Structure formats: structure tokens, C-alpha cells
Amino acid sequence: MKNLDFAYKSRKKTFPVLEDISVRIRGAQLVSILGPNGVGKSTLIHCMNRILDPTAGAVTINGYDVDGISIKDLAKFMGYVPYSSVDNFPLSVTDTVLMGRHPHSKWGTLDDDLRIVHEMLCLIGIEDLADRNFNELSAGQHQKVMLARGLAQEPRIMFLDEPTSNLDIKYQLEITKMLRRLSREKNMMVIMISHDINIAAKYSDNIIMMHDGGIFALGKPADVITSENIKHVYDVDAKVIMDEGRPHIIMIDDDDTNYDDDHEFSVIATKSGETYKGP
């Protein structure tokens, strides 16, 4: 990207979102985009994958402007997993993931497409959902299915907008670790928006930290995730410690209220129907 700008426009006013963003990302790696709400993270990846057209500047792949690449060819090259699926698919999970093969299809569904779909379902650990109706699944299951669909495209670049937001901590770690592994195994660039700084720091090769519509810092996690940067971008105090060469943040509570453990509590109803009073 070079000198990228984007603004939403109404009849009377322009609302700038991104201003003069220039960054070059190379090779198979996991890149996490961090920053508070409203700084333009989703807009940035939407400009990268041509969902939105920049107001100014250009996005290039291997020297080619994405504007000159057909949508179908671009879909062979780029995959995208949105923040949450609002799509209504009256389809089975298998058929939903099979939609990811569309950019590669010629005349109907081939055995190779079905094989790849099955591999992706097994990779994400949802093969037991293969025959379930997509619309009957939970939010977390939706997210896994959409991730499998994106991977079924076999893209060279994968964009993900908070891919673990509806998952519990076990699957957040597993999915993020898997994305880093896939970047190596499939020679794929993975660009992921995240709000979990510690998970991003643990697994990312590089970090882009955004603030006020621009890139505030970029580079290795240890160089980007510092107490000073966290304070400037998020306006919170944090202590950063190093764990096996990776930064880990600990929030500093400036509330000077003293708490003790001498608090009574009660559970009104338990599974057995009895009332339990705490210590």
C-alpha cells in the first residue's frame, strides 16, 4: 500500500477514516492489526481486498494494482473471513464451505473440491457438523465454518476480522496458533485484526498498531507492544514483561480502593435446588 486514504462521503460532508497509509508486507507470515475501536482497522483490510475503493493511493500485489485484477482472479488469490457472519445460508455446513471453492470451479463440483472441503472441516475440527444446517449453529460454530470456507479458497493472502471473537480461550489460542502454522505450511500471508493484545503478541510475526486513522507503530511484537505505545494508543496504563522473547501486558489499575476477601455471597439456586451461602 502506498499513500492510502479512505473517507466515507455524504451529500454534505466527508468523514476521513484512513489517512496516508503506506506499508509493505512480504512473505508468508502472520500479521496482526491492533488498535482501539473506530481507528479504521476493518476499513484498512477492506481497502486491501477491494471490498472498498480507496479515496487515494494504491494497493498492489507483486507490483500489480488490485484495481486491474478481476474479482474472480482476486478471489483465487485473497480469502476473507468477516468479523461475524450475518449471512443466511439455508445450506449444510459442507455446502457452505464448498462456496469457498467457487473461484476455482469450472463445471460443477469436482471430487477435488469435496476433498479440500473435508480437509478444511477436519483442520478446524468441525467435521462432525458437516451435515448440520448452517443457520442452526451457534455464533462460535458460525465463525469456525466461515474460517473453513475462507481456507477452502486456498488463497495466498488471508484476511480475517477478529476471527476468534466468539470463541472461548481454548479455541482462541488453537485457531491463532493454527493460522501461524498454516502461514508456513501453505506459504500464505495471514493478516488478522485482533483485540487480544497478548494473543497477538504471542503468535504474530509482525504487528501493525493503528491510531486515529493511521499506522502508529509497526514491526516485531517486542518493538511495537510497549508500555508507552499502549498508553498512547489505548490510553491505559500497562506493564509489559517479556516471556520467552515475547511481550506480555499486565494492566495497571489506578483505582486506589482497597479490597478485602471478607465479603459474604450466596447462590440462590443450585443444581440440586438447595441454597448455598458462601464463606
Language-model regions: role of each:
Residues 158-162:
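Catalytic Walker B motif of ABC-type/P-loop ATPase nucleotide-binding domains
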Residues 133-137, 141:
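Conserved ABC ATPase signature
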Residues 57-65, 74:
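Conserved ABC transporter NBD signature motif
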Residues 98, 111-129, 154:
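Conserved ABC ATPase "signature" region
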Residues 34-36:
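The feature captures the beta-strand-to-loop junction immediately N-terminal to the Walker
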Residues 233-279:
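ABC ATPase nucleotide-binding domains
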Residues 49:
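Helix-to-loop junction immediately C-terminal to a conserved catalytic motif
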